[in-house]
Amino acid sequence: MGKGVFINTGCHFQDQGGITLGDGTFLGNNVVLTTMNHDFDPEHRSTTYPAPIVTGKNVWIGSSVTIVPGVTIGDGAIVGAGSVVTKDVPPYTIVAGVPARVIRKFDPKTDHLPSTHKKTHEDK
């Protein structure tokens, strides 16, 4: 686990395949990281297949996201709340949905991402 990692409440880790969280990774509440899969064939379902989950630096994973075995999430990526991540996420990419799809890519040095802070009536 990297430095400055934040894990919110209700997260579940099934880690037989290994989980690596890069520096500054932020997990919203109720995130599920599962690193074990099994065969579809009923006769072979008792055979399990572990695969690691890896996040780069400064990754933000929204609330109630599920990440399946073998996924790598690149530096600075953002995963929208409620998403199911079944494929690798490139660095500096926003993904969301079931299954998660690319919403947009961004350059952290030049793109302005909107704040998640909602203004009140008193804010100007």
Feature locations, PLM:
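Short hydrophobic beta-strand segments in globular cytosolic domains
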Residues: G62, V68, G80, V85-T86
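A generic "structured core" feature
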Residues: F6, G74, I78-G80, V84, ...
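Leloir-type glycosyltransferase catalytic cores
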Residues: H117-K124
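Acidic, glycine-centered active-site loop in nucleotide-sugar glycosyltransferases
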Residues: P90-P91, A96-P99
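Flexible, glycine/small-residue-enriched loop-and-beta-strand segment within the central core
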Residues: M1-T72, V98-P99, R104-T116
